[in-house]
């Protein structure tokens, strides 16, 4: 009797083991949606790049789509229009109505505005960049070209941030840590130069192999044109080199010469302009239209400084930049 029971239990356990191993083996396959791409397909087809790259690019300078709400326009107004634009005299508030004139235009920094500047200048750049880094650099066959474009885009957004805030979290971002140390502005700038240099090298090598474009759907600025990305990166490298010329003359000269001597060169034509491209099936609207339009925010007017320069030099662009309201 005992022998029979043992045999029955043994058979049952064996069957259970077979069922378990079979169900475990098939579980992932059974739960796949046959109508959606899996991760391997998404990486091969550039689906994920097409999701995150445009999101990164539209936050370099906050540029809303026509279908967006006013969040990006408000971010642009607080972090750019009522900040640097006002300080250098390009624009001036029509009515300094915010917080009884105690705001950035009068060099008063409220916590709410500063936090918003930080969020849109740093958090919204790093979030899609981290995804792009993981997508393009974590497999056996990394997509170095797309990552190079992501690097250039990241630096385009963040060089303004370190100029505003000084030290920022940078070198350790994206490494999976819950807390990230702040890097000095000098350290951040040195990383900028190194990363731009590497990005240009990657894209130039790609170009020399007779490859002039990356997937267009993933890039709403240059629609995948590698040579234009190289010119933008070199121009950005030159800009940053000029900014550090008094802090580190040798560093500035090194990277200024790298930018100028690159065979592709720097931006010299309006065709090289970096902008959200309408040809990428996107309808964008510049925040200044909404900020200055009398029928919308009606908050901004020409600044005295730029008026003096443009009138003094009889600059013909003045009628394109500004309209006389009478």
Task: Report the location of each language-model feature.
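Bacterial Sec-dependent N-terminal signal peptides
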Residues: 1-32
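Alpha-helical transmembrane segments and their juxtamembrane interfaces
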Residues: 16-17, 65, 249, 325
């Amino acid at each position: 009797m005992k022998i029979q029971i043992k045999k029955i239990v043994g058979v049952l356990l064996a069957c259970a083991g077979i069922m378990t191993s079979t169900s475990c083996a098939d579980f992932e396959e059974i739960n796949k949606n046959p109508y959606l791409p899996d991760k391997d397909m998404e990486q091969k087809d550039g689906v994920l790049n097409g999701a995150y790259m445009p999101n990164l690019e539209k936050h370099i300078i906050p540029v809303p789509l026509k279908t967006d709400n006013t969040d990006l326009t408000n971010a642009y107004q607080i972090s750019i229009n009522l900040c640097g634009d006002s300080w250098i005299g390009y624009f001036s508030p029509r009515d300094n109505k915010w917080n009884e004139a105690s705001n950035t235009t009068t060099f008063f920094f409220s916590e709410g505005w500063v936090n918003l500047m930080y969020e849109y200048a740093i958090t919204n750049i790093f979030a899609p960049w981290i995804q792009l880094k993981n997508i393009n650099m974590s497999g056996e066959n990394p997509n170095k070209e797309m990552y190079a474009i992501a690097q250039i885009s990241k630096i385009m957004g963040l060089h303004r941030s370190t100029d505003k805030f000084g030290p920022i979290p940078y070198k350790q971002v994206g490494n999976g840590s819950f807390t990230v140390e702040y890097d000095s502005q000098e350290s951040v700038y040195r990383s900028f130069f190194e990363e731009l240099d590497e990005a240009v090298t990657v894209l130039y090598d790609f170009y020399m192999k007779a490859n002039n474009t990356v997937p267009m759907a993933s890039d709403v600025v240059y629609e995948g044109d590698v040579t234009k990305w190289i010119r933008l990166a070199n121009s950005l490298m030159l800009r940053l080199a000029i900014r550090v010329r008094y802090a580190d003359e040798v560093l500035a000269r090194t990277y200024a010469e790298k930018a100028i001597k690159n065979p592709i060169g720097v931006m010299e034509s309006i065709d090289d302009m970096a902008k959200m491209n309408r040809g990428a099936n996107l309808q964008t609207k510049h925040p200044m239209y909404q900020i200055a339009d009398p029928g919308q925010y009606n908050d901004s007017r020409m600044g005295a400084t730029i008026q003096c320069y443009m009138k003094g030099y009889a600059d013909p662009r003045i009628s394109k930049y500004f309209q006389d309201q009478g």
